[in-house]
Structure formats: structure tokens, C-alpha cells
Amino acid sequence: MKWAAPIVSEICVGMEVTSYESAEIDTFN
């Protein structure tokens, strides 16, 4: 189960980056 925590945190970071990039794109458009 040691792999569970890193994967969850990685998914959270990925979602944050995606939403951040989407917000930037919406602002510029």
C-alpha cells in the first residue's frame, strides 16, 4: 500500500495544474 499515497498526491497535483492552466487559457481568450 506504499504506492497509494504518492499516486493520490500525484493525481491531486495534476488536477491542480490542469485547472490552473485552464483558468489561464480562459483569461487570455
Curated annotation (Swiss-Prot):
Pathway: Cofactor biosynthesis; pyrroloquinoline quinone biosynthesis
Record flagged with keyword Transferase: no
Assigned keywords, A-Z: PQQ biosynthesis
Any Pfam family: PqqA
InterPro entries for this protein: PQQ_synth_PqqA (IPR011725)
Cross-linked sites for Pyrroloquinoline quinone (Glu-Tyr): E16-Y20
Tree of life domain: Bacteria
Gene Ontology biological-process annotations: pyrroloquinoline quinone biosynthetic process
Family classification: Belongs to the PqqA family.
Cited NCBIfam families: PQQ_syn_pqqA (TIGR02107)
Role of this protein: Required for coenzyme pyrroloquinoline quinone (PQQ) biosynthesis. PQQ is probably formed by cross-linking a specific glutamate to a specific tyrosine residue and excising these residues from the peptide. There seems to be another source for PQQ in this bacteria only.
Record's protein name: Coenzyme PQQ synthesis protein A
Lineage: Bacteria, Pseudomonadati, Pseudomonadota, Alphaproteobacteria, Hyphomicrobiales
Record gene name: pqqA
